[in-house]
């Protein structure tokens, strides 16, 4: 009899423990918020000796952007951002002695009657803005540049003549649809890259 009571008591206690353990919630693992992925930014290579890289705050602001630079030693200028106007290009032609200018990430704001780089006697390589859509008569004329590059695919009309016996190479993007008459007169090209979108080639 005592054994039966003891067995019953044991079963009751065991059942109580089981019920008690079922009532307890299993603790949840706290989920840590996902860490944001930080993009890897490649450090920019330092400017080479004689090179300046500037951002122009406003049209006509190139001279101010070059303040503090050793202009006598400057041979290459890269304008990383900003809008340049005719006053900026006049400053390049009249006050600087650079041999290369890279405007691929800048913007030119010139009127149809503006002269651009006309008459520049030191530039050997000109890289035009990637967003330029047209060129006019004198913008790249009568320079001593041996190479002119038009990056990007915005240029539709190459309307100006270069009139440059020194020019050996010019690269026009595939977006160009028309070339002005006598555009390459008085030039001695060794290499010319024309657009596949040209509707006609002037003679």
Where are these regions (language model features)?
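Consensus positions within tandem repeat domains that build extended binding/scaffold surfaces
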Residues: 116, 136-139, 159-161, 180-183, ...
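Short, low-complexity, disordered segments immediately C-terminal to signal peptides
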Residues: 26-42
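Structural signature of tandem-repeat unit edges
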Residues: 51-57, 75-84, 97-109, 121-134, ...
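Leucine-rich repeat
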Residues: 65-70, 90-94, 115-119, 139
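Bacterial N-terminal signal peptides that target proteins for export
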Residues: 1-8
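The feature captures the LRR N-terminal capping module
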Residues: 41-70
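C-terminal motif of bacterial Sec signal peptides marking the signal peptidase cleavage site
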Residues: 18-21
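Short acidic, Gly/Pro-enriched loop/turn segments at secondary-structure junctions
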Residues: 85-89
């Amino acid at each position: 009899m005592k054994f039966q009571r003891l067995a019953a008591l044991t079963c009751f206690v065991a059942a109580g423990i089981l019920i008690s353990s079922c009532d307890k919630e299993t603790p949840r693992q706290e989920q840590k918020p996902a860490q944001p992925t930080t993009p890897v930014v490649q450090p920019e290579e330092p400017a080479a000796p004689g090179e300046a890289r500037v951002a122009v705050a406003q049209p006509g602001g190139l001279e101010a952007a070059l303040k503090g630079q050793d202009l006598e030693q400057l041979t290459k200028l890269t304008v990383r951002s900003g809008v340049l106007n005719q006053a900026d290009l006049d400053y390049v032609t009249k006050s600087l002695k650079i041999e290369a200018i890279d405007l691929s990430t800048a913007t030119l704001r010139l009127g149809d009657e503006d002269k651009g780089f006309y008459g520049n006697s030191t530039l050997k390589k000109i890289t035009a803005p990637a967003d330029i859509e047209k060129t006019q008569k004198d913008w790249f004329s009568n320079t001593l540049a041996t190479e002119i590059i038009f990056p990007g695919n915005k240029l539709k009309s190459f309307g100006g003549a270069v009139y440059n016996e020194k020019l050996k190479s010019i690269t026009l993007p595939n977006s160009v649809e028309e070339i002005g008459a006598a555009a390459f007169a008085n030039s001695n090209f060794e290499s010319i890259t024309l657009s596949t979108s040209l509707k006609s080639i002037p003679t």
